[in-house]
Amino acid sequence: MTGVTDNTFEPNSNLTRAQVATILYALEGKPGNNTNAFADVAPTSWYYDPVNWCASKGIVAGTGNGTFEPNRDVTREELATMLRSYAAYLGGDITSAADISGFADAASVSAWAQQPVQWAVAKGLMSGRPGNMIAPQGTATRAEMAVMMKNFCEAYGK
């Protein structure tokens, strides 16, 4: 991860969907890809190659109607889903699953995100927030992503 400027990291700032794709793309050495998968990802945007490369590998998905919403803050359950898809792309184990029923808001995890969130908790990538909350629809911060990526890289040898 890089800072938002040369000398500012902004750990408490929210992370966007495009930023997640850019981080994962950078981990893979910034491979080329010029196939535009989404109507709202302009070829001139800084995230064009990262988003389209991640989409071509099944790491990220759109939000409907051919869009990606690159500048929207990523939710914690979306982030868990993207990281699990990235682990699968790497050939890593994605079968781990923690019992998340102990979190006060476990029932609010979307059905499509159940397995990714359980996997992220099992792998030590995601932990609760104050109040014993998993906060699946809460936005992920840059600090949370930094910790998740550190743990991910240790778990998957990146």
Residue ranges and their predicted role:
Residues 55-56, 121:
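Alpha-helix C-terminal capping/helix-coil junction sites
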Residues 2-50, 57-77, 85-113, 127-140, ...:
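Feature responds to low-complexity, polar/acidic, surface-exposed segments characteristic
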Residues 117:
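Catalytic cores of secreted/periplasmic or lumenal enzymes
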